[in-house]
Amino acid sequence: MNRHPGGEAQTLHLLEYVKLRKGMEALDLGAGEGETVRILKSLGINAHGVDLSPRSSDVETGNFLHLQYPSDSIDLCISQCAFFVSRDQKNALSECWRVLKKGGFLLLSDLDIGNLSEMAEQTGFTILRQENQTLLWREYYLEAIWNDSFCSEEYKLLQKEYKGKKLRYTMLVGRKE
C-alpha cells in the first residue's frame, strides 16, 4: 500500500506545477520511507527527507515543526499526508516559509478542515494551484482500513478528534514571493 493517497502518481502530479532544475534543493517533510526523496533524486534534485520515525537511509530523523535547516536555503518543500497528523499545520507552514528561498515552492497534499489554503496565504504564500482530492483520500482510507495497515490507528485517533467536522483532502501549490 502507498504511504500517502495517490502514491507516486500523486507525487508526480504535484511536481507538474514546478519547473524543476538540476541542483535544486528540496525537502520532503514527513518523508517516511523516502519514496518522494528517491523520485526527486532521480530527477536531478538535491533532495532531503525529514521524519520523526524515518524508515529509510534516505530520510533523516527530525521534526518538521522545528527544522534544522537554515532560513532561505530550500527551493522546494513537499509534504504529503503529514502536516495534519502533526496537529499543527500552521507551524508546519511557517517552517516551510522560513526555510524556503524567495521564489521557492510549497507542494502539499493533506487533510483539510477547510482552512488550509487560508493558513498558507496568511503565512505569506501565493496560492498557484488548489485541487480537492477528497475522493483519492477516501479510496486510500478505505484501503488502509481493509488492509489493517499502518495508518488505520492514526486515522482512528483523528476520527475521534475531528468527529463532526467535514474533512477533505486538498492539494496545494504555493510560492514564496
What kind of region is each of these model predictions?
Residues 4-22:
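Conserved alpha-helix/loop element of class I SAM-dependent methyltransferases that forms part
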Residues 27-66:
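Class I SAM-dependent methyltransferase SAM/SAH-binding core
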Residues 65-77:
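A short acidic, Gly/Pro-enriched loop at the edge of an enzyme's catalytic core
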Residues 76-88:
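A short SAM/SAH-binding and catalytic strip from SAM-dependent methyltransferases
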Residues 90-105:
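A short glycine-rich, Lys/Arg-flanked "PGG" loop and its adjoining helix->strand segment in the class I
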Residues 113-124:
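Short alpha-helix
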Residues 131-177:
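Conserved Class I S-adenosyl-L-methionine
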